[in-house]
């Protein structure tokens, strides 16, 4: 199966502006099917979830459909899908709930390649109970995060290891199954930030070995909220702070307040959109996997062109060269401030922003301080013309 990129692009109203969007790692553009699903849900007549009125049943149906959609997207039990305002908020909530069982001297492990949303919640939760945060470094040249580097930080006191599925700036994709085996051998839990991985590769949570897997629908064509999945039996053992009359069932006990039904409808529509990118299989899970494999192949080939072009521009420095990566380039141009590059590209209708993008530990570790670099990420709607325009803009700055 292959992607029909021209057809895909017609489903994205934002592309009519002529802008080349390389800012997908910060949030993708939205296809019309998702926007229509959200609008239809908001006007369909909803109430709080229940079983008496039609409005209550519609609300409940929206939630259950979204749980099933996420289950089909990442290969998990829908009963272990919980929704939150953002991945960051969900990670804070879960880290604090888990910390209730930690003791002074216990340890959590975090990595310098991660987004701060998968670092600070764990570090702060550890500090709150007298536990210790241990750090895993990555290779500055290749940006690889090795299993051995993680293993060196494990001990009998390790309670949680937090690691990215893919770096949101460098694209690094650690060997999660191998890391999971090491973490589980130490008797600890593995919390995977899959926000940047999920839009670019097929995901099977069980194969990855993740006890928790977090993602954000707005990175894969949906609305702005967060998702965490885990086995329902694991969630049953965790008791987050919640309101007294709120449901104590799993996963509802983790979902504070009324859920954003329109966003959940958008998530279901986004998964349906992904499933239809390059597959006509009978069941949605199979369609998702086939479409994501086709997407991964397309993005890898186009990203090769982008990397080759950037490497051929004098003064451009690319950071990291991991063996397995998402289509994400992090670069600087000698003699030019990152902001200057960003603004020059923006003036030409090419969106490739510059920042640390909350991967502040990675930015500092690379010697970039808090300012980071320019980031260019591909999406299914990115085409060769977009890449040519980006390369031309960078070359103009580098002259």
Where are each of the predicted segments found?
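Pyridoxal 5′-phosphate
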Residues: 1-399
């Amino acid at each position: 199966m292959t992607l029909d990129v021209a057809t895909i692009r017609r489903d994205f109203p934002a592309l009519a502006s002529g802008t080349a969007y390389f800012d997908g790692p910060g949030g993708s553009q939205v296809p019309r099917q998702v926007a229509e699903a959200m609008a239809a849900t908001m006007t369909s007549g909803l109430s709080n979830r229940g079983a008496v009125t039609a409005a209550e049943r519609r609300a409940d149906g929206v939630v259950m459909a979204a749980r099933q959609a996420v289950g089909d997207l990442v290969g998990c039990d829908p009963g272990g899908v919980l929704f939150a305002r953002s991945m960051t908020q969900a990670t804070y909530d879960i880290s604090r709930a888990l910390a209730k069982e930690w003791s002074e001297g216990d340890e959590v492990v975090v990595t310098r390649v991660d987004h701060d949303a998968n670092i600070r919640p764990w570090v702060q939760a550890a500090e709150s109970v007298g536990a210790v945060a241990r750090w895993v470094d990555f290779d500055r040249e290749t940006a690889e995060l090795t299993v051995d580097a993680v293993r060196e930080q494990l001990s009998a006191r390790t309670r949680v290891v937090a690691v990215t599925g893919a770096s949101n700036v460098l694209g690094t994709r650690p060997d999660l199954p191998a890391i999971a085996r090491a973490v589980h051998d130490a008797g600890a839990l593995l919390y995977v930030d899959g926000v940047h991985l999920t839009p670019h590769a097929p995901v099977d949570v069980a194969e990855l070995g993740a006890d928790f897997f977090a993602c954000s629908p707005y990175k894969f064509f949906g609305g702005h909220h967060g998702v965490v999945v885990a086995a329902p039996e694991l969630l049953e053992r965790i008791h987050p702070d919640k309101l007294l009359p709120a449901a104590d069932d799993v996963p509802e006990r983790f979902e504070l307040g009324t859920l954003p039904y329109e966003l959940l409808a958008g998530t279901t529509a986004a998964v349906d959109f992904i499933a239809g990118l390059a597959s006509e299989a009978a069941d949605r899970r199979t369609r998702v996997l086939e479409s994501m494999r086709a997407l991964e192949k397309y993005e890898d080939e186009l990203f090769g062109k982008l990397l080759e072009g950037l490497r051929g521009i004098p003064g451009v420095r690319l950071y990291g060269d991991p063996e397995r990566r998402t289509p994400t380039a992090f670069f600087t141009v000698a003699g030019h401030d990152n902001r200057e590059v960003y603004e020059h590209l923006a003036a030409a209708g090419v969106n490739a922003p510059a920042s640390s993008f909350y991967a502040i530990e990675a930015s500092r570790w690379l010697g970039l301080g808090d300012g980071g670099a320019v980031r260019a990420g591909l999406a299914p709607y990115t085409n060769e013309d977009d890449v040519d325009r980006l390369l031309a803009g960078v070359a103009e700055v580098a002259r």
